[in-house]
Amino acid sequence: GESHLHDGRVCQDSSASFSDECGTVAVVSDGHGGCDYVRSQIGSAMACEAAVKNIRRLFENISPEAFLAEPDMMLIQLEAAIINDWNESVRSHYEANPFTEEELDCVSEKAGASYRSGHRIERAYGATLIAAAVTRDYWFGIQIGDGKCAAFDEAGICTQPIPWDEKCFLNKTTSICGSDALRDFRHFYSEK
């Protein structure tokens, strides 16, 4: 955020949250800052919206008992639904707002050729995503990309419960726009 303000660039980060009788959710998404990701500020907002929508749907439609009977399967289905909704949002936005020449002039030659042909346009919207949810019966975190999800227990001890991804190193990260996004998602859950 601060460097974007200093350099006069658009901040590509987004966040969302909600809390109701079912649970509490916090979501953050970091748009990719590279030149080829000219719509990542839009993509990060879409990622947050997709996560909130689908976590809310999970809370409303899946009982705690059903979730806890197969938590890994439930979280993989949640991650798949988020990816699907994000891709649908990207496609709808792109169809209503094709790339401008100004946007295409900013990207690499390779990305420009791809975007002009309508191929892999979702890369322009690329973003990471971290979401954490707490209910009375369980809590979980899901993540794709770099960044850290920190959790504090009642004693104030901090942990990072979502497993780290070795593919996220230095300037490299996995992304919701990746062709292996579902495989690249990772998660954690607990009853405590």
Short names for language-model regions:
Residues 1-192:
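PP2C/PPM-type serine/threonine phosphatase catalytic domain
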